[in-house]
A protein has these predicted regions:
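Peripheral, non-catalytic segments of secretory and membrane proteins
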Residues: 1-89
């Protein structure tokens, strides 16, 4: 089980990866908007870190299924998912 500090480190790493995609002008506009919404959801303190991470993982997984998604974006999204999967409470 990860400690609270480790969970926050994983969360910050995932947020960094997602923020890079959200601010990259070569990322499709609809993906940037969706990622921006997910970032806000991760930062909101309404639910526990693990619940926020699981909700984000689900949404990111749905986004990676889009066949029109550029491969570099898909790879970065998988990286964020992999980081978020390490969060445990």
């Amino acid at each position: 089980m990860a400690t609270k500090e480790q969970n926050l480190e994983f969360l910050n790493n995932a947020l960094s990866t997602m923020n890079q995609l959200a601010t990259n002008p070569s990322t499709p506009k609809n993906i940037r908007k969706n990622i921006g919404d997910l970032i806000e959801g991760l930062k909101a303190g309404e639910y526990s870190v693990s619940v926020r991470a699981l909700n984000t993982i689900s949404s990111l997984d749905d986004m990676t299924q889009d066949p029109n998604l550029p491969s570099y974006v898909r790879t970065s999204l998988w990286q964020a998912v992999s980081t978020l999967e390490n969060i445990r409470e």
